[in-house]
Amino acid sequence: MHIHKKDLIATIKLNGEEINLDTANQLLKDPTLKPCHIVIHLEGVTELDEEQLDALFYLSEMVRAEGEHSFVVVYEHYNPDEFPEELIACPTLQEALDIIEMEEIERDLFDD
């Protein structure tokens, strides 16, 4: 696992073996990630099983629970027909950053 933080965005690179509930809980307990939008970059991962998707969904729900932070999965093999609607995902890091920016604008508009 590799974590890179820039401004209020934490990009976390995970390999296939690291995508599980233990890793999700470890990330949720990290106080340095609390104020951040989270991007999970599944670099080199070619397939996701149901257990891995469940772990990503759990992490997404926990991060987004308070409505203040975004959670996006970067998965280069992303296919919207095969990926759960509940998870926000895209094939590139730039798209993930764009999604976070759009969600920030939405939050600002609806908070006023």
Where are these regions (language model features)?
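Amphipathic, Lys/Arg-enriched alpha-helical "gate/interface" segment within cytosolic domains
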Residues: 2-112
